[in-house]
Amino acid sequence: MKVAGGLELGAAALLSASPRALVTLSTGPTCSILPKNPLFPQNLSSQPCIKMEGDKSLTFSSYGLQWCLYELDKEEFQTFKELLKKKSSESTTCSIPQFEIENANVECLALLLHEYYGASLAWATSISIFENMNLRTLSEKARDDMKRHSPEDPEATMTDQGPSKEKVPGISQAVQQDSATAAETKEQEISQAMEQEGATAAETEEQEISQAMEQEGATAAETEEQGHGGDTWDYKSHVMTKFAEEEDVRRSFENTAADWPEMQTLAGAFDSDRWGFRPRTVVLHGKSGIGKSALARRIVLCWAQGGLYQGMFSYVFFLPVREMQRKKESSVTEFISREWPDSQAPVTEIMSRPERLLFIIDGFDDLGSVLNNDTKLCKDWAEKQPPFTLIRSLLRKVLLPESFLIVTVRDVGTEKLKSEVVSPRYLLVRGISGEQRIHLLLERGIGEHQKTQGLRAIMNNRELLDQCQVPAVGSLICVALQLQDVVGESVAPFNQTLTGLHAAFVFHQLTPRGVVRRCLNLEERVVLKRFCRMAVEGVWNRKSVFDGDDLMVQGLGESELRALFHMNILLPDSHCEEYYTFFHLSLQDFCAALYYVLEGLEIEPALCPLYVEKTKRSMELKQAGFHIHSLWMKRFLFGLVSEDVRRPLEVLLGCPVPLGVKQKLLHWVSLLGQQPNATTPGDTLDAFHCLFETQDKEFVRLALNSFQEVWLPINQNLDLIASSFCLQHCPYLRKIRVDVKGIFPRDESAEACPVVPLWMRDKTLIEEQWEDFCSMLGTHPHLRQLDLGSSILTERAMKTLCAKLRHPTCKIQTLMFRNAQITPGVQHLWRIVMANRNLRSLNLGGTHLKEEDVRMACEALKHPKCLLESLRLDCCGLTHACYLKISQILTTSPSLKSLSLAGNKVTDQGVMPLSDALRVSQCALQKLILEDCGITATGCQSLASALVSNRSLTHLCLSNNSLGNEGVNLLCRSMRLPHCSLQRLMLNQCHLDTAGCGFLALALMGNSWLTHLSLSMNPVEDNGVKLLCEVMREPSCHLQDLELVKCHLTAACCESLSCVISRSRHLKSLDLTDNALGDGGVAALCEGLKQKNSVLARLGLKACGLTSDCCEALSLALSCNRHLTSLNLVQNNFSPKGMMKLCSAFACPTSNLQIIGLWKWQYPVQIRKLLEEVQLLKPRVVIDGSWHSFDEDDRYWWKN
């Protein structure tokens, strides 16, 4: 087909994946030939992790040694290098230069050892060093690997190098020319190279297979002893012929030489790690179309040729789920026989050693939802069962548990797979490299006259680059970019979001080519809607492969099918022409989203339900659990309602698109902002990605109008881009938490895209995106709190962030880095402290600080422009010298009001300079947190002395220190003095008992300042509480909040507490969680609650051993009490009958309860309905298992 400007958009152009991997797609009913030649970079997910990188120059031996070295952590690897330097310096024959060892990473070091020592000595030296480091497990693993990777037979050693280009089907001299030509980026030369490669591959295939068979001879001879060597050879010969032909058909085997590092990586995929874990299942996961199936097939071929798993597996069987599903019932025996050359497989002999079998299950996603319908398992490999039962049984190691598995699955299917698979190792398959992606977009997607401008546009569009990892999507994007470059006939939207690019492709393919009209007629629109309906039902049912019945149900006949083939949207399956798939899953998601828009044309806009028979309403997506497999459909739906895409859609359809869909999507996002407690970080991030697809600033602003606080997990570049775009249009945002992980390269000197011209290499792509994100944070007019807890930031990232937060317009008052990894760039923070006059609170909890860091911090705090009021240095690994510096700040900083050193080894020695500072009249500190600091009674003596003279300190936390009764006695003596200003005292888990309570009771008698006391997790027992109650009944005691969690209390103390509840005019909160009060104890408390004089507003009865027997008394008390607003009843054993009584009390008009701690799921449906009715009757009531307070920040001051 041709468009204006002479642009040729034939089938070959459509699927030209990259300069190095050209493939073609025919327009007739033949195979869809997808380009699936992924690079296999270092990236693993889930348990257990192994780090991998590949290099074309690595031999199996050096790669095996590299695998062992990757087992070392950073410190161990440095130790290994030091020991190697020592050994090398002592050697008189082969010494490696010291500087080369010092500068080598894992890959280089493995190569250096092989270069200077040779394979055998390299392994022996490494094993010796492992033993010196006392790494016995790794040493044993290395010995096993040495035997496999460094055989004595020199010919075998050559075989282990991996096949040469002359010995692999489809690899020839032309491929080398093709690789060189690709670098020159000339389409004509690339085409010539591909033609030459095709001819050469055809001429040499027979010779290469023969050579591979000769190579296999030695291996076959070794297995002959097992009694079926001939059978093995026949099977391998059959596999080589079959899979070599498949690779040749796909035209994707020209990169085999470059892919050999993948094979080397997979060679060790089943090896034990340093902890002794050895998986029997390896999962290859990645994006749809990334090349997982191609890699799986290549594994089979590589094994058959003798290059992989020799000596480990006698047989490797390829089980494509899609083809297996065609039979209602089968057995493992039948599947094996079907793969055998003459269908007469020696099954008994094969199954006699299951530990030498490898099954490759390709396409776990193709099972769809069938696994949800049946949980049956099978143990007999000869028994006939539905294919999904056999697959589940293999995955769960019920069937042939000793065998090994490789499973391919899309990223979106990994969560479902995790519930089926047993102890797997996950390996991520990533697509083509950044350099290849840029080449692809420059050569295929941008006109020659736009190269310079286009390169800058590509570099700025990280989403576009990221999606081009998948060759099929990259091909589609290239065509779309070309369409957008054409002016005139094309109706493509000028929008470079993925929705815009997919729309450019699909709308162009659907547009009639006639001169008279450019829009679809009614009949064509009906066909389009039917087709899109099939797509949407496939999305919801997790179905991506369709058969004739699916087409028939939707009323799609042969003529419509031919049209879809011609448009390269729906294609015959590459493995079976009776089935049909979309060119890529993203096209199915796009068409599914388009269905909702088409449906709205036939219904009044205000009533548009976005509903089909087997799907969910658009507004029910959140409530129904919009699973990850349908995320892109939702994102495309948002993109379709944007102005840039809607206008060309209206041209195509020949009628206006109603706005009902847009209004419902707007409402869905708004709901997330209105219910922040019910919104997960993933929900918010998903909404941001959806909004990003619209590129409509006004729409985004309206959607985010209700958002005041957000939590975003930033795990990839696209998350950062979408978040940056949305947050700058979030008008009332006040608090944000961002967990940034995995987006910054470990080696900051590494260039992300070497193909980029030198004049554009001043910053990496991610640095530019991060700078934009930080600029938004620094200039947002309403943002007051930034939490980067758990983030991993490099030195450059920290420098950029801090530079933006120093901006005069930055309004941030609270900056939090709790448990963040920012040590390399922490020095940049102190300039913010001095420059940003709005910053009031800084939390560095969990950040390791050196003495120099603390010195710089103290210098910043001394600066006259510093107005910091709160500093948290929890668990920062501080030393005694640090406390000396910090104590000096307490006497010189007029602004610092709160200091936390929790989790540091302050000890009694460190408390002394801090106490000295507190005694100085210039000290303005009000809150001091010394939780878990190793303080004893000796340190209490210093603190007690400071409390006497200090007039400012009102909050003191000494929890989790071994103070004992003696230490508390010293503190209480000071607290009894009139000059002590202490108001809140935390003594949780300080080894206090009844005697300690006696000292505290004496202190309370003469202290009118203390209002909050926490004694949780101390064995004070009933007698201790009774001593406190004696004082609390007195009007002179002003205690408002008493925490007695897990204090070994029983019903014996409840009468005393009840008396306090009824008589005290000050006690507002009492927490008795995790004490064995029982029904009798609570009944006694209820007597106090029923008294009119009770002012208690908050009562904690979690895990107090309550049953339905106390519900009557509790209900009566709740009905009478008008002050109690918060009640925690979690983890108690109430029957439905008892809960019905409580629900009646909750709903009573005289009850003022607003926060009720209960696990709804713990009770039957009828009780859950009653609780929901309470919330409908009283909308302000919160019923939740996570009991909280309206004054969380104030109540838990020592935590925030």
UniProtKB/Swiss-Prot annotation:
Compositional bias (Basic and acidic residues) spans?
A: 142-152
Q: As annotated in Swiss-Prot or TrEMBL, what is the tissue specificity of this protein?
A: Expressed in cumulus cells (at protein level). Highly abundant in oocytes and early embryos, however poorly expressed in somatic tissues such as the liver and spinal cord.
Could you provide one GO biological process annotation from this protein's UniProt record?
A: establishment of organelle localization
Outcome of substituting residue 1114 to P: In OZEMA19; uncertain significance
Q: What InterPro entries does the annotation carry?
A: DAPIN, DEATH-like_dom_sf, Leu-rich_rpt, LRR_dom_sf, NACHT_NTPase, NLRP_HD2, NLRP_innate_immun_reg, NOD1/2_WH
Positions of the LRR repeats? 704-727, 730-753, 780-803, 809-832, 836-863, 865-892, 893-916, 950-973, 979-1002, 1007-1034, 1036-1059, 1064-1092, 1121-1142
Q: What is its main location?
A: cytoplasm
The family database entries (Pfam families) matched by this protein are listed as: LRR_6, NACHT, NLRC4_HD2, NOD2_WH, PYRIN
User: Does this entry carry the keyword RNA-binding?
Assistant: no
Annotated region Disordered: where?
142-232
Instruction: Please provide the record's keywords in A-Z order.
Output: ATP-binding, Cytoplasm, Cytoplasmic vesicle, Disease variant, Golgi apparatus, Leucine-rich repeat, Mitochondrion, Nucleotide-binding, Nucleus, Repeat
Per the UniProt record, the associated disease is: Oocyte/zygote/embryo maturation arrest 19: An autosomal recessive female infertility disorder characterized by reduced fertilization rate, oocyte maturation arrest at germinal vesicle stage, and early embryonic arrest. NLRP5 variants have been found in a spectrum of phenotypes characterized by aberrant methylation of multiple imprinted loci, a condition known as multi-locus imprinting defect or multi-locus imprinting disturbance (MLID). MLID-related phenotype spectrum ranges from intrauterine death to different types of imprinting disorders, including Beckwith-Wiedemann syndrome (BWS), Silver-Russell syndrome (SRS), and non-specific developmental and behavioral manifestations. MLID has also been observed in individuals without overt clinical manifestations.
Under PANTHER family, the record lists: NACHT, LRR AND PYD DOMAINS-CONTAINING PROTEIN 12 (PTHR45690), NACHT, LRR AND PYD DOMAINS-CONTAINING PROTEIN 5 (PTHR45690:SF7)
Q: What protein name applies here?
A: NACHT, LRR and PYD domains-containing protein 5
The organism named in the record is Homo sapiens (Human)
This chain is encoded by the gene named NLRP5
